[in-house]
Each structure stands twice: as C-alpha cells, then as structure tokens.
Amino acid sequence: MTQQITVIGGGLAGCEAAWQAAKRGVKVRLFEMKPNCYSEAHHLPGLSELVCSNSLRGDSLENAVGLLKEELRRLESLFMEGAEATKVPAGGALAVDRDLFSQYITSRIESHPLIEVVREEVTRIPEEGIVVLASGPLTAGLLAQEIGRLAGSYLYFYDAIAPIVAADSIDYGKAFRASRYGKGDGDDYVNCPMDEEQYQAFVREILAAEKVEPKSFEKVVHFEGCMPIEEMASRGPETLRFGPMKPVGLVDPRVGVEPHAVIQLRQENLEATMYNLVGFQTKLTWPEQKRIFRMIPGLENAQFLRLGSMHRNTFINAPELLMATCQLKSDQRIFFAGQITGVEGYVESASSGFAVGVNAARLSKGEGLVVPPAETAIGALARHITNTEAAHFQPMNVNYGLFPPLPGRIKKKEKRGLLAQRGLEALEMWLPELS
C-alpha cells in the first residue's frame, strides 16, 4: 500500500517532484498558494512561474548546466519537456516563453490522474505522511516559521555569496600559500598580495563600478558580518585593508614582508578544485566583478565558477540538516527540494525536484532510496548541498568544480568534455536503478 505524498510549492522543484512521483504510480497532493496569495515576485496564476529571466542558460556540454539539462532530458524530466515545447530563439542558450512555459507545466500537472492540485496557502507542515517542502526562495510567514521550527538556527533569509574561482586558473607565480600567523597547517589559504598602488586602484574601481539594483521585494539589509565590499569601500579608503584584505600575519615568502593588502582564497571543496574569495560578498554586476577581480594579482586569468551576490533568499543549511537523499535527518518522512535547499537556478531547482520526487515515490512504496552518481551533474550538485562544509555553506549553481576530479593530468581545454562524457556514462549506468 503506497502512501500519498504531499508537495508544498508549485514551482519548478515542486512540480518536477510531483510529476516524478506520479509517474511512478504514487498519488500526490500538490499545494500552491496562487492565485489566492502571491509573493512579492510572482505575477502569473500558473505553476512553475519563471520569475527573473526566461533563459535556462547555455546548452553546450562545455558548461555544467548544459550537461545537467542533457541528463534531465534523458531522465524524461517534465521541466525539460516543457522547455523544449515552449523554447524561443536564443543562440546557443535555451530560453522559453515564460507564459507558455507556465501554461504548459500547469496543464500537464493538472491533467495527470494521480496529481491533485490544491490552491491554498500552507501554514503548517503535515505531522503525518511523506512531505516534500519545495516552497522556494521567497518562503515567508507562517510556513517559514514552521520550517524554522524544523531547521532552528540553520534557516536563513538572505544570502551573501562571495565569488568562487577554479583552482587551476590561479597564477601561483604571484599568489602564495599561507595561513595567518601560520595557524592550521600553515598553508590553508591561497593569498593574492597587493602593493599600495594596486590596492588604491582596486578600491577606486570598486567605488566606481556598476551595482545591481535591488528588486522591489528586497529590502537592503546589511549585517556587519557580511557587508558588501563596495559598502565597506565607501566607508573610507583603508576600510578594506582593515577588513577582508588585511595583511597582518601573512608574510610573502618571496620578499619576506607583509604586503600592503591581501585577498585570501579559501578552499571550497574537498577536492580543492574551487576557491572562494574570503569576505568578498558583493552586489557589483557580474561583468564588473569579472573585470575588477581580474585586477587581483594571481587572478588575471581567473575562471569564475560562481560570481558574488546578495539577495533575498530563504534557504536552509542543507549539509547540517539533510541526508544525501535530501531527507531531513531529524524526520526522514520530510524531504526538501529546490532553492530552499541551497541550489541556485531554474535548472538546478528542477534537478533537485527530480531526485526528491523519485525518492519520495520509492519511500512511499517501501523501496530502497537512490543517490545519483557524483560523476553526474545531478549527483555532483546533490552531493555539494548535503556534503559540503556546513560552516561556510551558501547557495550554488551547478559547475564543473563540483565534480570529482579526473584521474591523471588532463589538458585544460579537454577537461570539460571529458567530465561531460564521464557524467553521461555514469548516468546510463545509474538508469537501471531507477526502474
């Protein structure tokens, strides 16, 4: 006897989770608060509304999001079915007609005999049965309080994201390894030194740079612990040098003295393929970030795997709270899916919903749960949000820095293609587990 699944949230993750569970013969009640109640960012009455952009980003396997989309195609994702049915010309990217996309997904969901769409706001999490929480990045009110009851201090309402660069794009001829005062293993950080002239030019460019204007639903809330670098720079020319760029305790071994200023890069993952710019959360536009941060000695040719941002975003500390299957450790009948888990982006949200929908159905039927291989884009993203360092967890787009490294020395221009090939091969080997 299968248990009915309750899905809270009719966005990309919730719809994908509901669809995958129903495809596997399980009844689903999908709760969506629209059109009775709208968030500040939503305007369409339908399901799976794309709020900010109609672009689903590049289709090439040279980009990890392209691989993620190809995996979802092969897995017969409703999200990708809808995207292909409503796509518009966009060069090498995949973009959709937002209204038609929402209408398509809504029609498919509402016409499925095993899915009941309930148009009402959820204010309490059911105390029995299997539940998928996919309420999205603007979760607020009583439902946010309910999630807070489960998550405790590990529920956040704003993100403060620093850029991440690929380790193999750092120029170690200019950067040096060291920890402040030799603490830890002594070389835990990669340090990019600046002299006084470089520092002053860097600060000038930050102050003059174009910034992202906050959305109407985003109140500007800056906490001292995660102040944007441009805000710090506006407080005085030396503020950054006494904040995230302070050089004290860091001696450049090539000259034997402390630099005028230092940008520290901290290892982001166990494989040491990604490093983040410590304390460099920012609201500079992405083109300005690339231009200005490539002024940093050692990062002139940096490959940015994630760019900085600060915005309204309800999410949990997934590594602290969730199992590898995105079940709540403290109550395994509850799954989390979508951006509330810390995945960032449309495709990533659908991917999260796919994996959770499959496992919610399997739990309902008393079957063993499955985890996608880490070599796949779906698996690499899932592993990141549930198995990264909880203390520094922030939302993340899919990127090749999340994947297990390839064995041996690989030419840089060949690496992405080989990672994509390995990912698709791993996916094909995983498919029998899903049947």
From Swiss-Prot:
Which terms are listed as keywords in the entry? Cytoplasm, FAD, Flavoprotein, Methyltransferase, NAD, NADP, Transferase, tRNA processing
Where, per UniProt, does this protein localize?
A: Cytoplasm
> What's a Gene Ontology MF term here?
tRNA (uracil(54)-C5)-methyltransferase activity, 5,10-methylenetetrahydrofolate-dependent
What cofactors does this protein use? Answer: FAD
The record, for Pfam families, names: GIDA (PF01134)
* InterPro entries per the UniProt record, alphabetical: FAD/NAD-bd_sf (IPR036188), MnmG-rel (IPR002218), MnmG_N (IPR040131), TrmFO (IPR004417)
Q: Name one GO cellular component term.
A: cytosol
Sites binding FAD sit at: G9, G10, G11, L12, A13, G14
EC number(s) stated in the UniProt entry for this protein: 2.1.1.74
Q: Where are the transmembrane segments?
A: none
Is Cytoplasm among the key words of this record? yes
Which reaction is catalysed here? uridine(54) in tRNA + (6R)-5,10-methylene-5,6,7,8-tetrahydrofolate + NADH + H(+) = 5-methyluridine(54) in tRNA + (6S)-5,6,7,8-tetrahydrofolate + NAD(+); uridine(54) in tRNA + (6R)-5,10-methylene-5,6,7,8-tetrahydrofolate + NADPH + H(+) = 5-methyluridine(54) in tRNA + (6S)-5,6,7,8-tetrahydrofolate + NADP(+)
Give one GO biological process term. tRNA methylation
Q: Which family does it belong to?
A: Belongs to the MnmG family. TrmFO subfamily.
HAMAP family recorded: TrmFO (MF_01037)
Q: What's this protein's function?
A: Catalyzes the folate-dependent formation of 5-methyl-uridine at position 54 (M-5-U54) in all tRNAs.
Protein name from the UniProt record: Methylenetetrahydrofolate--tRNA-(uracil-5-)-methyltransferase TrmFO
Gene designation: trmFO
